[in-house]
């Protein structure tokens, strides 16, 4: 059994990412109930009824003036406690030579805009013969977003997709009415010592798009431009910020930004109806408030929020439209509880399609 398969077994015993968690629209006042969850098995999203076609990403490495910083210079930033409404600590599972930190869903906060699932995996160093080994499993009514800093994962799905993902790429898998996928490693990767470090997030789909045809989209890193904003390299992975629009497909207003800051560098953050800042590495300061490594700051809607790096840091900013009520159980998310029950019955009865090239194994529905 590979390491990622172990993650599923162990996280099912943890009081996070409830398998049957009801997520109300006013989720700030109704924390998720404790329950069982598993890696790559929980999430949510909602948005506009019309699907947006993204614009083409601008070219690489152009220095741009930060419009958020311009606003701050005119009227001053929002800082400290006024900017941070909640500070989340990760639920960490140690798997020996691998760890996973889960930030969403959490008891204090279930969703940020359309984002409902946020896992930070690694960094992990694997010896030969160990690594990523997630057997085929299903999803409905959501989209998975995988982004790596180091390493490689091999994606297969029931549509016939076969796609390695490497650092800088985005893999967007739209489950829609139902998809099955696995995440493993190419034999040549698994045969040698290797490292893995990255983020896996989930979005739920707008009610009007929950039952769309499943799809898989791969965006090479070269198609996602790096911009230098106030001296810091910034990548707009999804949505629009800093005058840049990502080519990655969205179904609702969605924001996903990665940035790297050197010690002492400052960055004004873009606006969004809801937003949260995750410290992948390093330490940040927001006014007089310290944001430690692996913490997630739920930010206010104030337009001007500026962070400063106490040490060399990497950050991920997520946000977007707040969502309506969603249910979540195992790998299934839906606005309708009965739809999840149907998905469970279909998986139990073997009615989902198989993954070509990975037909021999599957993850059973948890008891």
Regions found by a protein language model. Give the residues of each.
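Generic extreme N-terminus detector
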Residues: 5-7, 67-68
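Short linear motifs in low-complexity or flexible loops
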Residues: 5, 15-17, 21-25, 30-34, ...
